[in-house]
Design a protein with these regions (language model features):
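Short beta-strand element of the alpha/beta-hydrolase
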Residues: 22-33
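Residue in the alpha/beta-hydrolase core beta-strand immediately N-terminal to the catalytic nucleophile
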Residues: 59, 93-94, 117-119
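Conserved alpha/beta-hydrolase
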Residues: 48-65
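N-terminal cap/lid segment of alpha/beta-hydrolase-fold proteins
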Residues: 1-23
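Alpha/beta-hydrolase active-site loop
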Residues: 40, 70-94, 100-107
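The serine-hydrolase catalytic nucleophile loop
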Residues: 34-46
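Hydrolase active-site cap/lid region
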Residues: 110-180
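Alpha/beta-hydrolase
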Residues: 31, 58-60, 121
Length: 180
């Protein structure tokens, strides 16, 4: 993909379930969020009571192994999704996104007509929510205002140096984002 490669895992359907549910999509493409690995999300599939579809998970740009390879996150999520579907020869699939993957899956579905069904699980409407939702409710509008008007830059830089000292989750997210 581009100058690199995407990691993908394919788990084939249970043939007995496929014959019992012939109307089910043949494939479910599962997508992680901001910091996931393809190997992590496959664990969700263990909880399906039946599995009449193949499951494909992948690390898109800016996720999992692609981060380690220096591939940055890209907003046009339909492109890596279509590349994975092309690689596996998938004509039509349902798609599920978890966390920020819920946002990404909707983007992919909006521009990839081969996605027939969408499940946005535990999603965020914008990446900034991952930083502001853990804040006390009274501070969220202030954070939104600062990010919405990133001037002066020194103020943003100072806030990003100080805030992580008081919030381990924010500290980790900013550290993770520095790789993207």
């Amino acid at each position: 993909y581009g100058d690199g490669a995407l990691t993908a895992i394919r788990w084939e359907a249970d043939s007995a379930d496929r014959s019992r549910f012939p109307e089910a999509p043949a494939t479910l493409v599962m997508m992680n969020g901001f910091d996931g690995y393809a190997e992590e999300i496959i664990g969700f599939a263990e909880h399906f009571s039946s599995r009449p579809f193949d499951i494909i998970t992948f690390d898109g740009p800016g996720q999992g192994n692609t981060v380690l390879a220096g591939m940055p996150l890209e907003p046009e999520w339909e492109h890596p999704t279509e590349a994975v579907m092309d690689y596996f020869g998938i004509e039509s699939a349902a798609a599920l996104g978890v966390s920020f993957g819920g946002y990404l899956v909707m983007r992919a579905a909006a521009y990839c007509p081969r996605i027939s069904h969408v499940i946005a699980f535990d999603m965020m409407y914008r990446l900034l929510d991952g930083l502001t939702l853990p804040l006390p409710r009274a501070l969220r509008p202030i954070a939104d205002a600062i990010v919405g008007n990133p001037r002066p830059a020194w103020l943003i830089d100072a806030a990003m140096r100080i805030a992580p000292r008081f919030n381990a989750d924010l500290s980790w997210k900013l550290q993770q984002a520095s790789h993207l």
